[in-house]
Amino acid sequence: MKRIVLLVFAVAALAACGRGDIQQNLGPELLYERGQEMMNAGNYGGAVAYFQQLEASYPFSNLTRQAQLDIIYAYYKAGLREEAIAAAEEFERENPTHPRVDYTLYMRGLIYFDQAPNILERLFRVDMTARPPKDSERSFRMFQELLRRFPDSEYAEDAHQRMVFLRNRLAEYENHVARYWLRREAYVGAIRRAEYAIQTYPGAPQLEESLQIMIEAYRRLGMDDLAADTQRVLERSFGNPSETFSID
């Protein structure tokens, strides 16, 4: 339905200015200007129509690269997330060394961030043995790649803040899954999920619970030495636990 709406907007934009004008008479500057006008008016389908015409008619214009970036944002604002991600990925493939790749990585991370449902809601609706929520994980990886490649990007601070939020949510998810395995007496599975959280999401406050899960699992397996070692790591990292650990 959203794709149909976007198509209607695009057709309306073409009709408003004349299809022949867009195809033949408008130069790159005017095409881009008209696209920006459509964008500012909230007509994202019309904006895409102008930007795509600019790309098709003037592929080597300096404005074409900016138009390609604007198409990503227009799709995003129109609610066409898959199209926005595809446009961002295409830009990265065609322009791997372009200085604005930081923007495409940021937009991909933002789109996945917006798509990620509340993890606690998912925990009560899906099998607890399911893998971590894909959209949250993808968003985390996109922001991670952005910070690795473009540490001085204007989007770096926002990406970092979102990563902290995602890191904590994903670590919490892993703990919920590990608790599930602990209740099922699948102690090796519980240890592996807790270890995964510790290795993948360093710095998350939820890792205190991850260590507690490992201690409990080791004890139930009769591995008292490993339980004691993990207890020392817990105390060194977080001090004495403030609450008694429970698997419920």
Region roles according to the model:
Residues 13-248:
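Acidic, polar-rich low-complexity tracts and alpha-helical solenoid repeat scaffolds
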Residues 1-17:
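Sec-dependent bacterial lipoprotein signal peptides
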